[in-house]
Amino acid sequence: GCRLWQTSGLAKRLISGKYLSIVLRGRHDAICHAPSAGGGKYPPALVGICEVENDSVLFDLTKRAGLREHKYEYIITNSKDNRGSNTALLYQRDRIKIISKRSYTPTLQSDPLKTTRDILHVTGKVINDEILDIFVCHFPSRREGIKRTRPDRIRCAELLKQKADSLFRIRKKANIIIMGDFNDYPNDISLRESLGARSIKSRVSDKNLYNMFYHYSDKTNTGSYKYKGKWNFIDQFIISGNLLNISSKISIKGKEAHVYSEPFLLHDDNKKYGGQKPFRTYSGFKYLGGYSDHLPIYMDLIIKD
């Protein structure tokens, strides 16, 4: 199967046989250690990265640095983002065969001339010949204010919804995985209404989208990101209903997604908030030596013959 990882960038893993693991991670700087550790005996087959500067970073990461032994290839967008960051997907060729790759550029409502990260869409065939459609996203931040920037995230969600609906029309059983840093919570308008991502605990239909972390919204001590002492999920997996059907040829193991929160990814929060928080690389211009201000998330896919 497979394991899917997301970091503040994104990571995904396929184990030989029955499980595909998908991971979403934050930035590339933590990719080297976290996916290797998170994969256990086998590295993630797919690794999604939400924030990476350029092609050369991924080349060094996969061909020269710590991930070289895992024989990853990569796909990266060429966004016109104001901050110079892109989304990307690492994959192992013996675990998934890439059929097509494309990127979509959202038009932002707040300023048509303003740019953000492109949405990466990769279509691949896994070991049982089932088709998997993977989207890697990084929605516009809240830095300029939640209300002011909300329309931009809604625009991105509407674009994603359009692409997902197109796949629902052309595929008999669409296997869609949308992952990324959405800069919104599962129950925010952009994801709940514009994208239409529901709770996995609601009635499931093959033609709808479901948020693997929607039902975590009210839990106070879990999340991928900590802001002012409160944990929450702005990093999420959103999937098509077919992946929640245990009789499908691809399904999500245990209908669960997880946060990877090993001690090396955490350090003590300040005295005001207490507890721990993700061990980030920088605080302003000060180098801290950590991995990311987001924790990776992951889930396993069961792949049937």
Model-derived segments and their meaning:
Residues 56-59, 83-86, 143-146, 185-190, ...:
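Extracytoplasmic/secreted cell-surface and envelope-processing proteins
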Residues 114, 165-176, 184-305:
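Metal-dependent phosphoester-hydrolase catalytic domains
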Residues 14-17, 24, 31-58, 90, ...:
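Active-site beta-strand/loop signature of hydrolases that rely on acidic residues for catalysis
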Residues 1-17, 100-102, 131-141:
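Active-site-proximal beta-strand elements of phosphoester/diester hydrolases
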Residues 1-65, 75-80, 85, 270-275, ...:
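N-terminal, active-site-proximal structural segment of metallo-dependent hydrolase catalytic domains
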Residues 46-48, 52-139:
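Structured beta-strand-rich core segments of catalytic domains in phosphoester-bond hydrolases
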Residues 13-22, 43-49, 76-77, 108-109, ...:
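Second-shell loop/turn segments in exported
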Residues 74-76, 120, 124-216:
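Extracytoplasmic, non-cytosolic globular domains
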